[in-house]
C-alpha cells in the first residue's frame, strides 16, 4: 500500500526520507503532529481547569466558587486574551513528544502482540494504560511545570528556570511530584478511552460509509469514549493538581484525597470537571482522528 500511495502522488509520502522511516518512528511523528494541533487549540480549557482546582486548594475556596465562564472572563480581563494560553510552552514540551511516545508505544505493542487479531476489550484497556504509563513517567517533570505555570501562583520566567528551581528547592522528587495520582488518572483514561473508542468504531459499518465521512464518524466515536473516560478519572486529576501545587516536599496520595473529602466533600473530587472533560475529550478525539488519517496516508494500520 505504501508504494501505491507514492505512485499516486500523495504529498505526505513523496519524500524518500519519509518513505524510508521505520513504522514506529512514523507513528511517533504522526502522534506528535496530532498532539501539536490538539494542544494548541484546547490549552485555554486546561488553564481554566487548573485555576478552578487551584482556587479549591486555597483557604478562600470555602467562600465564593468561581464558575468556568467567569474564570475565562477574568483571565482575559487581567491577562489579555493570550493569558488563556499561559503554560502552553510546557504543554508543548510535554504533549508533542508525549503524544508521539504514546502512539509509537501503542503501535509497537499492538503489532507485537496483536498482529493477527484485534485486541479484546480488556486487552485494549491494558494496551492503552501501558502505553500511557510510559509516556506519563517520561513527561512528568514538564507536567509539574505546566500545572504550576497555569495556576498563576508561581513566578517562573522560563521552563528551564522552573525545572531548575524545582530541582534546587525540592530535589528530584519535586520533578516527579504527583506521580501516583498522574498514573491513576492518565493510565486508566487512556485504557478506558481506547476500549470504548475501538468498541464504538466496531458498531459503525465502516464498509458502508463514504471514506470522506470516516474522520467525522471517528471523531464522534472519540467524543463518546472521551466523556466516559474523563468522568471516571476526574478524582485522580484533582488529587494530582493538589499535590503538584502544594509547597510541601512530601505528599501521600491517600492523605491528599482525605483532605479534599474532609474540606469539600465528594463534589471536591469533580472540581474543574467540565473544562477538563471538554478538553480531554476534544483533544483525544482530535489526536486520534488526525493520527489515524496520517497513518492511513502513510499506508500503515494504526
UniProtKB/Swiss-Prot annotation:
Its annotated compartments are: Mitochondrion inner membrane
List the disulfide bonds in this chain.
none
Record's bilayer topology term: Multi-pass membrane protein
Reaction catalysed by this enzyme? glycine(in) = glycine(out)
- GO annotations of cellular component type: mitochondrial inner membrane
The residue intervals holding the Solcar repeats read 22-112, 119-203, 213-297
The record's section on PROSITE patterns has: SOLCAR
User: Which GO BP terms apply?
Assistant: erythrocyte differentiation; glycine import into mitochondrion
Note whether Acyltransferase occurs among the keywords.
no
Q: Which UniProt keywords apply?
A: Membrane, Mitochondrion, Mitochondrion inner membrane, Repeat, Transmembrane, Transmembrane helix, Transport
Name the Pfam families on file. Mito_carr (PF00153)
Predominant localisation class: mitochondrion
Spell out the molecular function terms from Gene Ontology: glycine transmembrane transporter activity
Question: Secreted: present as a keyword of the record?
Answer: no
Q: InterPro entries under this entry?
A: Hem25/SLC25A38 (IPR030847), Mitochondrial_sb/sol_carrier (IPR018108), Mt_carrier_dom_sf (IPR023395)
- What transmembrane ranges does the database entry give? 28-53, 87-113, 125-150, 178-201, 217-243, 272-290
The source's domain of life comes to Eukaryota
PANTHER family, A to Z: MITOCHONDRIAL GLYCINE TRANSPORTER
Q: What is the stated purpose of this protein?
A: Mitochondrial glycine transporter that imports glycine into the mitochondrial matrix. Plays an important role in providing glycine for the first enzymatic step in heme biosynthesis, the condensation of glycine with succinyl-CoA to produce 5-aminolevulinate (ALA) in the mitochondrial matrix. Required during erythropoiesis.
- Family, similarity comment: Belongs to the mitochondrial carrier (TC 2.A.29) family. SLC25A38 subfamily.
Q: What is this protein called?
A: Mitochondrial glycine transporter
Species of origin reads Xenopus tropicalis (Western clawed frog)
